[in-house]
């Protein structure tokens, strides 16, 4: 069970809505993933009508919607987008994204912290997408963010946990949930994130661009479950030396 702010989730896999070939395929993949929290970019939906091709099936599926501010380049733009989302969707939950560079889509740490502090004061449950910077994540936690979402690698790159060393520090020092966001390309990346202590992962591109998104979504669901179970089982310590699983002495005498 994962708790973030005022909500609890059985699934530790969050999903996105971009890059799918159709809305129907998107919904089928989300259902296969078991995800209960789904992000959507405000710039991609028509907020004037709930029969929007992306929004309507998500509402029907009964998942928790997490609007994001993707496309915002400044704190001011992100705050404005957040206010529109709250008014249109009736939710105070928000994934805060501010990335001014369209090529790398790396989050702006200064603008993100600035916007996060303002949005928390306005009553939003803020989940900020940020770099894998332990100091920044701690500052975001201190201003009231309900979770932190450090990247594993650039958005959509499928590179995996390239920031593993920093993610481990973030996880170790965090007192709010840590959701590894961006860069996760295959289910084993998700397993690794859960094994190392992350509370959840957010996956979009890896599922949406697969030849079979529904099958890939299922694979990610199982991978996240495996990673969580492995962590709860408490793996044995790593060792430089070998440690025999069978006795090396006495077996000849026993056979005599």
From Swiss-Prot:
Its EC number is 2.8.1.10. Its main location: cytoplasm. One of its GO terms (cellular component) is cytoplasm. It is found in: Cytoplasm. It comes from the Bacteria. It catalyses: [ThiS sulfur-carrier protein]-C-terminal-Gly-aminoethanethioate + 2-iminoacetate + 1-deoxy-D-xylulose 5-phosphate = [ThiS sulfur-carrier protein]-C-terminal Gly-Gly + 2-[(2R,5Z)-2-carboxy-4-methylthiazol-5(2H)-ylidene]ethyl phosphate + 2 H2O + H(+). Belongs to the ThiG family. Homotetramer. Forms heterodimers with either ThiH or ThiS. This is Thiazole synthase. It comes from Salmonella paratyphi A (strain AKU_12601). The lineage of its organism: Bacteria, Pseudomonadati, Pseudomonadota, Gammaproteobacteria, Enterobacterales.
